[in-house]
Amino acid sequence: MTRVLAGRRPVLEAMRGNTKVRHIYTEPERTYPDISEAAEAQGIPMANRDRAGLDKLSDGVRHQGVVAIAEDYEFCEPEEIIAHAEGPPALVALDEVTDPQNLGAIIRSAVTLGLDGLIIPKHRAAGITAAVVRASAGATEHASIARVTNLQRTLLSLSKSGLEIVGLDAGADIDVRNLEPSPRGRVLVVGSEGKGLRRMVRQRCDIVVHIRQEGPMDSLNASVAAAIAMYEISAKQLGAANDG
């Protein structure tokens, strides 16, 4: 099975990562030396296709004149993410985040901040589509992502294995900035925009935190809130690793 990557940056990041890119199509009127050089080095065939053809191939995702065909996204297991962590693991789990832009932005932040991986549900949630890859600026191609059938069961299993499960909820009493470093490792759980954490998912959390807000606005976009919380979590885990 294959998937489509749309846009210069996502295609470049795919070639820089471990993604198997099969073909690259570009507009004949434009040149892409960085993509051409990388494709030639990896033996990836390139061909021209007009804008209408690229629009159809990308299924409406903005492509900047570059579309690639790659092998299906390779998910991993949560246990694999933990096993490859160099220090106390830091992961983010997403509870029914359905908006591709939010998912892509969260993946980009997680990769940039050095989190070990992400966990997303198989159902009632956005998948790793061309729109998500583009929204992540290609960060999906560098991320370790597990896709699970039952998020609640996965969180329970991770908690039993020793990780601390930290939920993010605007109504919580504890400020995320007040978390202490955890030598066990942590999983940050972020809910969907509007709905937040589902009740059963919230019950699986060992602790629930909020982001302190001082201004006149009373809410944050889901991806922005996730980025702030991930920064705090990653900083705490870095401190725990250094202390160890």
Model-based region annotation:
Residues V166-N221:
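Active-site/ligand-binding-proximal alpha/beta "capping" segment
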Residues E29, R51-G53, H123-A125, E193-K195, ...:
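Short, acidic/turn-prone active-site loops that include or flank metal/cofactor-
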Residues M1-A83, G244:
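N-terminal positively charged helical leader segments and presequences
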Residues Q64-V67, R134-A139, S182-R186:
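Short, hinge-like loop/turn segments at secondary-structure boundaries
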Residues M46-D50, S144-Q152, V209:
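Short acidic-hydrophobic, aromatic-tinged amphipathic segments that line or gate anion-handling sites
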Residues L12, G17-N18, T112, G117, ...:
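Structured adenosyl-cofactor binding patch, chiefly the S-adenosyl-L-methionine
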Residues E79-A85, S157-S159, R177-S182:
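Short amphipathic alpha-helix with an adjacent loop that forms part of the alpha/beta core around
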Residues L12, R16, K20, R30-T31, ...:
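RNA substrate-binding interface of SAM-dependent RNA methyltransferases
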